[in-house]
């Protein structure tokens, strides 16, 4: 009998929702397997799932799995996941038996009907983050040029970054804060709508603030939900502070969003109704999101001030000075965004 992926676990979240931190934390369990990173290429190698081929966006329903061609697509994708599985030590699974897959890719927020058809026993974790922090982080991600997903899609804000929701063509010339709010809103709206069709026992919600405040308690809760034991090595590792995730742009700071205060104020009326709906969907005991918009006295830096105080090293991460600049200019980092001043 070939290797079976039993009750895979999908983390569903808008981009920049601390989903990588949650994925890296739970990947330390001896009872979970993953492909080690996000599954962009693994999924989008199939034309019906690729916006640059046959798909129009990252939104995918169960339709591509229908018919004989769809059945073959499903088998091929399940095989691709199985062939790329690794445990926390990087070891391959045995050729037979069953394993539990942990998967996290923000684009999957738009693919729940597809994933539920691909794996009818799948479990889903909906991770939410404070909207001010989340949308501000999406803005930072676009500006960093480290999260470009579709380089051939040109926008007023540079090549398209992060997930590609339906309606993206209408935002090609939009201000960056509108694009960021659009991505946050589309991801969470589709998650809420699609998870409503999933049995209650196969889904749960989590606020990123819980993970940051008490990772041990969150891990214990998720192990119960996933139905796996917490092994001793996993538990002992959670006694230490969580490290920064691999995709962290800036060191965490509670008021970091304030530098985008003016931008957030402009988009807040549009997203406020969804915040109320998200709060209504949270599991009992899950902290609610702050529905209050940025206060009038939020620190708002003008573009010139932001540029003067901009630290390229914090945006670009750990880049060698002789490496190509991540901004895509073609120049070395030391001669571009890494220039010493």
What are these regions (language model features)?
Residues 1-10, 148-149, 156-205, 210-308:
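PAPS-dependent sulfotransferases, especially Golgi type II membrane carbohydrate sulfotransferases
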Residues 1-86, 155, 241-242, 247, ...:
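PAPS-dependent sulfotransferase catalytic core
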Residues 5-8, 98, 323:
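Pre-Walker A (Motif I) flank of P-loop NTPase domains
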Residues 13, 104, 329:
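The Walker A (P-loop) glycine that initiates the GxxxxGKT/S ATP-binding motif of P-loop NTPases
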Residues 20-23, 41-44, 109-111, 132-137, ...:
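Short catalytic/ligand-binding loop motif for oxyanion handling, primarily in non-cytosolic enzymes
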Residues 77-111:
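Glycine-rich phosphate-binding loop used to anchor ATP phosphates in small-molecule kinases
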Residues 104-105, 115-141:
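Conserved phosphate-donor/acceptor-positioning beta-strand/loop module used by diverse small-molecule
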Residues 297-341:
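Acidic/negatively charged segments and metal-coordination signatures
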């Amino acid at each position: 009998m070939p290797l079976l992926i039993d009750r895979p676990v999908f983390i569903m979240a808008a981009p920049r929702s601390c989903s990588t931190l949650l994925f890296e934390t739970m990947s330390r369990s001896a009872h979970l397997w993953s492909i080690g990173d996000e599954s962009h290429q693994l999924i989008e190698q199939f034309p019906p799932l690729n916006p640059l081929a046959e798909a129009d966006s990252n939104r995918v329903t169960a339709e591509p799995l229908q018919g004989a061609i769809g059945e073959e697509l499903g088998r091929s994708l399940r095989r691709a996941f199985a062939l790329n599985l690794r445990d926390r030590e990087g070891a391959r699974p045995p050729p037979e038996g069953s394993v539990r897959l942990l998967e996290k890719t923000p684009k999957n927020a738009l693919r729940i009907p597809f994933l539920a058809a691909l794996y009818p026993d799948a479990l889903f974790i909906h991770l939410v983050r404070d909207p001010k922090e989340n949308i501000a982080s999406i803005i930072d991600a676009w500006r960093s040029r480290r999260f470009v997903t579709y380089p051939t899609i040109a926008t007023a804000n540079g090549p398209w970054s992060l997930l590609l929701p339906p309606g993206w063509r209408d935002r090609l010339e939009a201000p960056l804060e509108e694009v960021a709010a659009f991505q946050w809103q589309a991801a969470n709206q589709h998650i809420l709508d699609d998870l409503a069709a999933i049995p209650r026992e196969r889904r749960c919600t989590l606020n990123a603030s819980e993970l940051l405040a008490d990772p041990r308690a969150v891990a214990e809760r998720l192990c119960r939900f996933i139905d796996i034991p917490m092994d001793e090595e996993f538990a002992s590792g959670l006694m230490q502070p969580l490290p920064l995730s691999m995709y962290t742009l800036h060191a965490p700071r509670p008021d970091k969003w304030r530098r985008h205060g003016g931008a957030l104020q402009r988009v807040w009326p549009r997203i406020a109704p969804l915040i109320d709906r998200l709060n209504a969907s949270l599991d009992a005991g899950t902290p609610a999101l702050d529905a209050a918009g940025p206060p009038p006295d939020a620190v708002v830096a003008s573009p010139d001030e932001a540029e003067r105080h901009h630290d390229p090293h914090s945006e670009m991460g750990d880049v060698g000075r002789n490496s190509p600049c991540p901004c895509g200019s073609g120049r070395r980092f030391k001669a571009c965004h890494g220039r010493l001043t």
